[in-house]
């Protein structure tokens, strides 16, 4: 096997026993140490005069949940919700509040940017969603303030073409806004958008996809582009858009629901040897293929997981399982430890498959990938990180994965649940 993008997986597969060295007593200290390292590496958030604090805070908060300190706030929130770290809960939540408050100030004081105001992973919607979660976890009644700001952004992304680059994908578009609302519904145990708001956003996604498919003469009902590229993967593409529509399928008209299922099946037909190309119409080069959450099987698996959970049709679960097999072969990625295009993102596929099947083989595989993260081979051969604290590219996402490895019955890819 060529290993240009990944390390060779030399691990034996599951033989009936989990790894004793990946128990709570071994992993919890690694989590704590990694969190402390992340907190030490954070950029200054500013202080003193308001203007100076605003400038410094804005710089630290650039990158939204994906690459900024808002993502660290989410990681700390996630850790605080685990009973395994109950003694540190209040400290982590206070740190999370300090970080997310800085990001909220940056949203308020910064230059208004129509392109990112309603963005989930790269802008305001994600910041307000995490602020809501942190405030709620602290027992503060004023969690309704960031929640109100999140709700108000619904009007921003309701127009069909509210973004020139593409209005429907996960990072900055409507799928991301719906995903954030789904996270809030799950964590707060209440719907945060009205049925009318949900229907308006879903209808805009459907209308946009229909219009694009007709304009480009596609032989299938829904298609989208981002900066002119017809992506298929979870980061910017068709799979996560369809995943969000399935997550709100009860709000769709029966005829539109049928278009979504036709599009899901169309995407399933684009599979090439257990993987999908980054964009529609590409042919995968097996020796150099992308096997990432952002582009490829490890991210597209979540659409088919959702399709299986909604429909109970075995072909969707079978597709997920094939995604897992490819990820076991080629998921020890050289791009780092993160969840977007790193080892933790690959390993989350195994935790997803464990929850879908109950097969302990997948916990074992996730344990092996976790073990590999701390080997000299990985440290020496993986790409140097621009930001160790990034939720998606750095160690904050890795911390979320390690926590979930210890509680696999609740495990889910950060901010991307199919179980709601």
Swiss-Prot record:
CDD domains found in the cross-reference section: euk_LANCL
Pfam families the UniProt entry points to: LANC_like
Gene Ontology terms: cellular component: plasma membrane
Superkingdom of source: Eukaryota
InterPro entries xref list: 6hp_glycosidase-like_sf, LANC-like, LanC-like_prot_euk
GO biological process terms held by the UniProt record: carbohydrate metabolic process; peptide modification
PANTHER family with a match to the protein in the record: LANC-LIKE PROTEIN, LANC-LIKE PROTEIN 3
Family: Belongs to the LanC-like protein family.
Protein name stated in the entry: LanC-like protein 3
Record organism: Homo sapiens (Human)
């Amino acid at each position: 096997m060529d290993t240009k993008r990944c390390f060779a997986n030399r691990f034996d597969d599951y033989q009936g026993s989990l790894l004793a060295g990946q128990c709570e007593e071994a992993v919890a200290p690694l989590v704590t140490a990694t969190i402390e390292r992340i907190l030490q590496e954070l950029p200054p958030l500013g202080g003193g005069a308001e203007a100076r604090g605003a400038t410094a805070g804005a710089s630290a908060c650039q990158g939204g949940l994906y690459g900024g300190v808002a993502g660290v706030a989410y990681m700390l929130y996630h850790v605080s919700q685990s009973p395994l770290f109950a003694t540190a809960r209040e400290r982590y939540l206070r740190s999370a509040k300090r970080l997310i408050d800085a990001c909220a100030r940056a949203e308020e004081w910064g230059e208004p940017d129509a392109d990112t105001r309603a963005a989930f992973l790269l802008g305001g919607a994600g910041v307000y969603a995490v602020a809501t979660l942190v405030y709620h976890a602290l027992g503060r009644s004023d969690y309704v303030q960031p929640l109100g700001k999140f709700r108000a952004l619904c009007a921003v992304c309701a127009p069909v073409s509210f973004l020139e680059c593409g209005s429907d994908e996960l990072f900055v578009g409507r799928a991301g806004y719906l995903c954030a609302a789904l996270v809030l519904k799950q964590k707060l145990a209440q719907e945060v958008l009205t049925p009318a708001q949900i229907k308006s956003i879903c209808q805009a996604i459907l209308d946009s996809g229909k219009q694009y498919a007709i304009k480009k003469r596609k032989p299938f009902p829904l298609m989208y582009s981002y900066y002119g590229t017809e992506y298929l993967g979870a980061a910017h593409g068709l799979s996560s858009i369809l995943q969000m529509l399935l997550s709100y399928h009860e709000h769709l008209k029966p005829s539109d629901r049928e278009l979504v299922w036709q599009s899901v099946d169309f995407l399933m037909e684009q599979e090439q040897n257990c993987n999908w190309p980054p964009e529609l119409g590409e042919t995968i080069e097996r020796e150099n293929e992308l096997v990432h959450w952002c582009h490829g099987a490890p991210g597209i698996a979540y659409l088919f997981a959702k399709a299986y959970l909604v429909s109970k049709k075995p072909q969707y679960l079978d597709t997920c399982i094939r995604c897992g097999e490819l990820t076991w072969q080629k998921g020890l990625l050289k791009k780092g430890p993160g969840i977007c295009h790193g080892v933790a993102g690959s390993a989350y596929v195994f935790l997803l498959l464990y929850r879908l099947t109950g097969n302990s083989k997948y916990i074992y595989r996730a344990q092996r990938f976790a073990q590999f993260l701390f080997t000299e081979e990985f440290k020496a051969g993986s790409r140097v990180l621009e930001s160790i604290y990034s939720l998606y590219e750095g160690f904050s996402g890795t911390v979320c994965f390690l926590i979930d490895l210890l509680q696999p019955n609740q495990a889910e890819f950060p901010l991307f649940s199919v179980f709601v």
